A protein has these predicted regions:
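A structural motif
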Residues: 45, 103-106, 134, 158
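CE4/NodB-like, metal-dependent polysaccharide N-deacetylase domain
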Residues: 90-111, 127-131
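Short, acidic/polar
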Residues: 28-40, 86-101, 120, 145-147, ...
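Acidic-and-aromatic substrate-binding clefts and catalytic sites of carbohydrate-active enzymes
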Residues: 28-31, 50-59, 83-88, 114-119, ...
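A short, structured active-site edge motif that brings together acidic residues
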Residues: 71-84, 107-114, 141
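Beta/alpha (TIM)-barrel catalytic core signal, keyed to glycine-rich beta->alpha loops juxtaposed to Asp/Glu
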Residues: 9, 113-287
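N-terminal binding-site loop/beta-alpha segment at the start of enzyme catalytic domains
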Residues: 1-74, 191, 285-287
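Structural motif
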Residues: 39, 43, 100-101, 132, ...
Length: 287
């Protein structure tokens, strides 16, 4: 979309540039993913976020190939699911993702969950980066204690940590920790799936109306002004375009301060430290 301002990027800890706003495909059915990604690319998105666990990498890859957009203009993220122990299993899983995507490399490879033999997984991911198959590696859903453990005992510090972040779970302490250690904060679930009546919240609605924007645009702008990478999803082209149109206004310090008290400091979905969730996610396998 040529009328939109230029996309802002963030510089990861190894110098790789990543768009601050991308398109996510979580929970988009396989039979709708190719069209959704095609529409997103046509709207102007150049960063795409998928995962082996989403089971739609093949559709993402087809949309990329059919778009005609040069590969070096795209930033593609996928994720490693919890693997059986051993570095070879991680490399096998990566090769399967790469084949499904139909690419010769990905820009960012994330460890999807902080479970299992994550040391072996991380060593394998370091090898993939050294081999040029991945431009940057990172993690997802890591709390600061486990993130610090990974940083302390490995050669490469994760470039990104993708975690649940929205107005009701703002993750300010995590954000400050990651900034201190050179890890880019990335949000999943920026709209909290509409929970807690996010789209009709009086505070968010009032601020959005003052700028002539939607609540969704306001939330994305709030995250971007915190230097948080965000990957909203939609299957509607009009919403895709709307979500991109967030670079022509700025929230004041006072407006940012009005949003801060909305933080409940708790997940609206599930706690990654809950033993039941650890067991459930840790035992699931993705081919």
């Amino acid at each position: 979309m040529n009328s939109l301002p230029a996309m802002k990027t963030v510089t990861l800890n190894n110098g790789v540039e990543m768009p601050i706003l991308g398109f996510g495909v979580y929970q988009i059915p396989e039979d709708q993913t190719e069209q959704a990604v095609t529409d997103a690319l046509a709207a102007g998105y150049r960063s795409l976020d998928t995962a082996a666990a989403y089971q739609n990498e093949e559709s993402v890859g087809r949309a990329i190939r059919n778009s005609g957009i040069p590969r070096d203009e795209l930033f593609v993220t996928t994720k490693l699911w919890v693997q059986d122990p051993g570095e070879s299993n991680t490399k096998r899983a990566f090769e399967a993702s790469l084949k499904r995507l139909g690419l010769d490399h990905v820009d960012l490879y994330l460890m999807h969950q902080p479970y299992g033999d994550y040391y072996s997984q991380w060593r394998a991911m370091q090898d993939l980066q050294a081999e040029g198959l991945v431009r940057a590696i990172g993690v997802s859903n890591f709390h600061t204690d486990r993130l610090m453990d990974l940083i302390t005992h490995n050669d490469i510090t994760p470039a990104v940590n993708q975690i649940e972040t929205h107005p009701f779970y703002q993750r300010q302490a995590d954000h400050d920790f990651m900034r201190e250690h050179g890890v880019q904060h990335e949000s999943w679930g920026p709209f909290a799936e509409g929970r807690n009546n996010l789209f009709s919240d009086p505070t968010l609605t009032s601020i959005a109306t003052a700028h002539g924007k939607s609540v969704a645009q306001l939330v994305l702008r709030w995250l971007i002004q915190r230097d948080v990478v965000v990957i909203p999803k939609s299957v509607r082209p009009d919403r895709m375009a709307e979500n991109l149109d967030v670079f022509d206004f700025e929230l004041s310090a006072g407006e940012m301060a009005l949003i801060a008290p909305m933080d409940t400091n708790a997940s609206l979905f599930f706690d990654h430290r809950d033993p039941r969730m650890v067991s459930f996610l840790g035992q699931r396998r993705v081919d």
